[in-house]
Amino acid sequence: MGRKVHPIGFRLGIIKDWSAKWHASDKNFAECLTEDLKLRKAISKKYVDAAISQVDIERQSNKVTVSVRTARPGIVIGRGGQRVDEMRHFLEDLIGKKVQLNIVEISQAELDAFLVARSVAEQIERRVAYRRAMKQAIFRSMQAGAKGIKICASGRLGGVEIARREVMHEGRVPLHTLRADIDYGCTRAHTALGDVGIKVWVYRGDILPEAKEKSESEVTEMAAVMADAPAAVVTETKVADIAAKPKRVVKKAEAEIPAEEKPKRVVKKAENITKEEE
């Protein structure tokens, strides 16, 4: 299952978040979806060399917030924010709504799966040997702090007539573990002999739920409650301890109990044994 399903979609709502956050009625849903596709396509065409990894879209009443995640924010922003203003006006004319454009910088491009896939694809387009490009990408990602990485290239690798598929990996990539922070990206390298598909999985570690730390006041309150516990609770715990003990210890404990407090069956057994001895 983990090998077939999309790694990001598999973890949505657990450790991953949606790239589009909005709600629309049945009538407006198709319109909003086509607007999202237009926005993403326009941004990717406008900034081809800006190393854009992801575009997040949020919608309010008459306002659309677009967050662009990029490893080269200077190319997107331009001198004095000139290119950002141009892009915002272009997007507003495209969809006919007010657009707020946010630029988010990616600190480590080697840990972003889509950017790693793009770097491999660009090298293949420049006629670099695909094995060399894949090995360099794996080395850089592991040096940047990745726990594991897997790269898959498929197509007419090396210009051969029959298309094939080659996979390289290093470290571990636990696809079935939902708490594992696995980034996934895919792209195409356009060559003279045909397209080469590149897929990249990057394992960046586990995302664990935050443990609730008890304050000192809570600890003192619990101690006070335990100190003031009634005697009935204590006796119940003793009975539970006896039930959890092995059989021999339980029989020994029953023998120590006085005859008046023993149940009727135990008393009858004791009387039968005394009669047989006599």
Swiss-Prot record:
Keywords of the record: Ribonucleoprotein, Ribosomal protein, RNA-binding, rRNA-binding
Gene Ontology cellular-component annotations: cytosolic small ribosomal subunit
Span list, region Disordered: 255-278
Signal sequence region: none
The keyword RNA-binding belongs to this UniProt entry's keyword annotation: yes
Transmembrane regions listed in the UniProt entry: none
Gene3D superfamilies assigned: 3.30.300.20, Ribosomal protein S3, C-terminal domain
Record function comment: Binds the lower part of the 30S subunit head. Binds mRNA in the 70S ribosome, positioning it for translation.
NCBIfam families tied to this protein: rpsC_bact
Family: Belongs to the universal ribosomal protein uS3 family.
Subunit structure of this chain's protein: Part of the 30S ribosomal subunit. Forms a tight complex with proteins S10 and S14.
Protein name in the entry: Small ribosomal subunit protein uS3
Gene: rpsC
